[in-house]
UniProtKB/Swiss-Prot annotation:
This is UPF0313 protein YgiQ. Belongs to the UPF0313 family. SMART domains: Elp3. [4Fe-4S] cluster binds at C386, C390, C393.
C-alpha cells in the first residue's frame, strides 16, 4: 500500500451539521410527485434534481447518489425525471425548491445518447423505461435549465453531470461542427459542478442553507462560475507564457580568465558575527491562489492552434494536488473554473455507497424494463477514477486520475445486500469493477509525486516507477467475495488494463481461473504505432504477453476461454494503410468482429482536439508543431469501419477500391494472405450494369478525341436521347 497522501480535504464529507429537515428521516424513494411529498409530510423540497434519465435508486445512477447524499445531510430532495421540456409545467410539479435546482442531462451526454458516431438518430435509449427513444431533448442541460428559469426565475440553477462537466470551457461540438461556448454561458445557469459532485454539492447546499447567496459562493473546488474579473487575492499568468523559459544565468568560464588577479597579500580571517535569525512564514506553493488565463472563446473559435493550446493547458490542470484555477473570456465576462475537488477517502466512499438505496427503479415505472438498470443491477462499483489517460476517453477528466477505492468490507456488505434484497438474483454477480477492472487500491507510491505530477497518463509510454502495480488487494477481494454463502459466481465484466495486469501475473491467474465466463473483454484499440501513439495506448507487445499468460492459466484451470479485443476505427493519426494492417492482423488471428466503433469526437477529449485542429496536444503546440492525420468525411470513415469487418461481403467492393488505390491489389484474391476475395462474375456484371447508365462529365478542357468517344458511346447506348 502507498504512503499517506498529501492531498487532503479541509473537512470530511459527513462532518457538516445536519440540516433541520433531517427529522423527517430517509424517504423510501426520493419523491417524484406531490402525492409522495404529502405522504412524507413535506410541504416543500429544499432541493429538486432534474435529470434526463429514469430515476433508479441505485448507486450506479448519478442522481440517486446525489439525492441520497443530500438527504443524508438533512435536506428534502425531490426528483423530476425525464420531464416534458415543451413547457415549464412539468418543472413545477414538485413546487418551488427552497435552495436550488440541480440539473443534469443524465448518466450520458444527451447528444451521444441520441446520435451515433455517424450523426444518425438512435432509435432506443437504455436509460428510459422500455428502451423508448425521444424522452430527452438535444443538449438537455441547456433546455432543462431554461425551463427551470422560466418556472422560478429567482431559484438558483446548478449544472452537473457528464454533459456539463465536459463542456465547462469553450469546446468543439461534433454535431454542429463548430466551437461552442461554455455550457455555463449558453444555459445562463448560476453555477456548474464538474466531475464527481459529492464534495461541492454538499458544501454549496449547506452554505445556501446558512444564508449565503449563490453569487457569494465563489471558492468551492470543482465548480465553475461567471465573473467579471479574477477573484480577489488571486494572481494570474497567461497560458501562452507557461512554456517560455525564464532568465538563464551565464555559464562561468571554466578557466577563470575573467576572474580578478590575486595580489599575494595575506588574508585575515573574517570575524564571525552573531546574526538575528528571522523565521520566515512558509512560502506558498506555486499553484496556490494562482489562475491561468486561457485564450478567449472568440480566439479559440477562430484559431485552431490556440484551441489545441487551450486544450493542452486544461488537461495539465487536473491534478487536485497542484492544479491552478482557469479563466476564459466569453464576450465581456469570464468563465472561472476552480481547481478540482479532493478525491474521496476510502471511509467517505464507504459512507456514500452505504446510503439507503433501494437498488430498484422507482415504483412509478411499474413493470417497465429499463435496459441500463438490467445491465448493472447485479454489478458492484468498487472504485472510481482512471490513471490510464487514453486520449479518446473522458473518464480521467471527469472522475480524476487518483483511484478512489472502497474498503473490502463495504464491497462485501453490498454483495450480501444484493443477495438478500434484489429481486431475481440467481447467485451470479455480473461485475466487480469500475472504469477499469484492475485498478482497485492502486495509486502513486510517492506522496510528493502524487501531489505535483502533471503527467497525462501514469502508464504511457511506460508505467511510471512510482505507480503501485501490486494486485494483492484485488486478489484478496475476489477470493473473499466468491466464498460468500449464496454466491455461485463472480464475473469481471469491466475492461482489464492488460499492461498493468502483466506486471502481476498472479492477478491474471486468479482472473482466468475463477472470474471469466468464457470471454474476457480487453481493448488494444489498434495494432499500429501511429494511432496507438495518439491514443496513448500500449503497443501489441503487452497484449501478446497478456494473451500468453491468459491462455496458459486458462489451460491450467481446464477451461476453454477467449479474449475479445475491442478496436476503434477512424481515430486521429490513423492512415488507410494502418487500418489495412489491422484488418490483416484480425484475419491472421481469426477474429470476426460483429460490433465495431468509429471514433466518436466527444467534448474535452484530447482525441477530439486532434480531430478538430489536426494538431497533437500531447506535445507542445505551435503553428509548426506536429500535424496529425485525421480520417474525415463519410467515405473514409465508412472505409475504416468496413476494414474492421473485412469478412462482411457487403464491405468487399469498398475495400477492393481502397486496396487498388493504395497499390495493394495483391491483397485481393483467394490466397491465404489476401484480405478480400476477387469479385465474382455476378458482381462484375452488376458493376457493369450500374455503370451502363452513367455518362462521362465532359468540359471544354476535355481532349477532342475523348469528347468524340464519349458522344459515340452515348449515341450507341441511348440513340442520342437526353441531349
Amino acid at each position: 500500500m502507498s504512503a499517506i497522501s498529501l492531498i487532503q480535504p479541509d473537512r470530511d464529507l459527513f462532518s457538516w451539521p445536519q440540516y433541520w429537515a433531517a427529522c423527517f428521516g430517509p424517504a423510501p424513494f426520493l419523491p417524484m410527485s406531490r402525492e409522495e411529498m404529502d405522504q412524507l409530510g413535506w410541504d416543500s423540497c429544499d432541493i429538486i434534481l432534474v435529470t434526463g434519465d429514469a430515476y433508479v435508486d441505485h448507486p450506479s445512477f448519478g442522481m440517486a447518489i446525489c439525492g441520497r447524499m443530500l438527504e443524508a445531510q438533512g435536506f428534502r430532495v425531490g426528483i423530476i425525471a425525464q420531464p416534458d421540456w415543451n413547457s415549464k409545467d412539468d418543472f413545477m410539479r414538485l413546487g418551488k425548491p427552497n435552495l436550488f435546482f440541480g440539473v443534469t442531462a443524465g448518466n450520458m451526454d444527451s447528444m451521444i445518447n441520441r446520435y451515433t458516431a455517424d450523426r444518425k438518430l438512435r432509435h432506443d435509449d437504455a436509460y428510459t423505461p422500455d428502451n423508448v427513444a425521444g424522452k430527452r431533448p438535444d443538449r438537455a442541460t441547456l433546455v432543462y435549465t431554461q425551463r427551470c428559469k422560466e418556472a422560478w426565475k429567482d431559484v438558483p440553477v446548478i449544472l452537473g453531470g457528464i454533459e456539463a462537466s465536459l463542456r465547462r470551457t469553450a469546446h468543439y461540438d461534433y454535431w454542429s461542427d463548430t466551437v461552442r461556448r461554455s455550457v455555463l454561458v449558453d444555459s445562463k445557469a448560476d453555477m456548474l459542478m464538474f466531475g464527481n459532485g459529492e464534495r461541492p454539492l454538499v458544501e454549496v447546499a449547506h452554505r445556501l442553507a446558512m444564508g449565503e447567496t449563490i453569487d457569494q459562493i465563489r471558492d468551492v473546488r470543482n465548480t465553475a462560475i461567471m465573473v467579471k474579473e479574477a477573484l480577489p487575492g488571486w494572481s494570474g499568468v497567461d497560458s501562452t507564457r507557461l512554456d517560455t523559459p525564464g532568465k538563464i544565468d551565464p555559464i562561468p568560464h571554466p578557466y577563470g580568465e575573467d576572474l580578478p588577479c590575486a595580489d599575494n597579500k595575506p588574508v585575515a580571517p573574517k570575524k564571525q558575527e552573531a546574526k538575528a535569525i528571522t523565521v520566515q512564514p512558509p512560502r506558498p506553493k506555486p499553484w496556490e491562489k494562482t489562475y491561468i488565463l486561457l485564450p478567449s472563446f472568440e480566439k479559440v473559435k477562430g484559431d485552431k492552434v490556440l484551441y489545441a493550446h487551450a486544450s493542452r493547458i486544461l488537461h495539465h490542470e487536473t491534478n487536485p494536488g497542484c492544479a491552478r484555477a482557469l479563466m476564459q473570456k466569453h464576450g465581456d465576462r469570464y468563465v472561472w473554473i476552480n481547481p478540482p475537488a479532493i478525491p474521496l477517502s476510502t471511509e467517505e466512499m464507504d459512507s456514500v455507497f452505504a446510503l439507503p438505496y433501494q437498488r430498484v427503479p422507482h415504483p412509478a415505472y411499474g413493470n417497465a424494463r429499463i435496459p441500463a438498470y438490467e445491465m448493472i443491477r447485479f454489478s458492484i462499483n468498487i472504485m472510481r477514477g482512471c490513471f490510464g489517460g487514453c486520449s479518446f476517453c473522458s473518464i480521467t477528466e471527469h472522475e480524476g486520475r487518483i483511484i478512489q477505492s472502497r474498503s473490502e468490507d463495504s464491497i462485501i456488505n453490498e454483495i450480501e445486500a444484493i443477495r438478500d434484497t434484489v429481486p431475481g438474483f440467481t447467485g451470479v454477480i455480473s461485475d466487480l469493477g469500475g472504469p477499469t477492472a484492475n485498478m482497485y487500491m492502486l495509486r502513486c507510491k510517492s506522496p510528493r509525486a502524487e501531489q505535483t505530477c502533471r503527467r497525462l497518463s501514469c502508464v504511457y509510454p511506460d508505467i511510471c516507477p512510482h505507480m503501485d502495480t501490486d494486485h494483492t488487494p484485488t486478489i484478496n477481494l475476489y477470493r473473499r467475495a466468491r466464498e460468500l454463502k449464496g454466491i455461485k459466481k463472480i464475473l469481471i465484466a469491466s475492461g482489464v488494463r492488460y499492461d498493468i495486469a502483466v506486471e502481476d501475473p498472479r492477478y491474471i491467474k486468479e482472473l482466468a481461473s475463477h472470474h471469466v465466463g468464457g470471454y474476457l473483454k480487453i481493448a488494444p484499440e489498434h495494432t499500429e504505432e501511429g494511432p496507438l501513439s495518439k491514443m496513448m495506448k500500449p503497443g501489441m507487445g503487452s497484449y501478446d504477453r497478456f494473451k500468453e499468460l491468459f491462455d496458459l492459466y486458462s489451460k491450467q484451470a481446464g477451461k476453454e476461454q477467449y479474449l475479445i479485443p475491442y478496436f476503434i476505427s477512424a481515430h486521429p493519426g490513423t492512415r488507410d494503410e494502418d487500418m489495412v494492417n489491422l484488418a490483416l492482423w484480425l484475419k491472421r488471428h481469426r477474429f470476426r468482429l460483429d460490433q465495431v466503433q468509429n471514433f466518436y469526437p466527444s467534448p474535452l477529449a484530447n482525441s477530439t482536439t486532434m480531430y478538430y485542429t489536426g494538431k497533437n496536444p500531447l506535445g507542445k503546440i505551435g503553428y509548426k508543431s506536429e500535424d496529425v492525420v485525421v480520417p474525415k468525411g463519410d467515405r473514409q470513415r465508412r472505409l475504416h469501419k468496413a476494414l474492421l469487418r473485412y469478412h462482411d461481403p457487403a464491405n468487399w467492393p469498398l475495400i477492393r477500391q481502397a486496396l487498388e488505390a493504395m497499390g495493394k491489389k495483391h491483397l485481393i484474391g483467394g490466397r491465404r494472405e489476401c484480405l478480400v476475395p476477387a469479385p465474382t462474375i455476378e458482381e462484375m456484371r452488376e458493376a457493369r450494369r450500374q455503370n451502363r447508365n452513367t455518362r462521362p462529365a465532359l468540359t471544354k478542357h476535355t481532349p477532342v478525341e475523348h469528347q468524340r468517344q464519349g458522344l459515340a458511346a452515348n449515341k450507341k447506348r441511348g440513340k442520342g436521347a437526353g441531349r
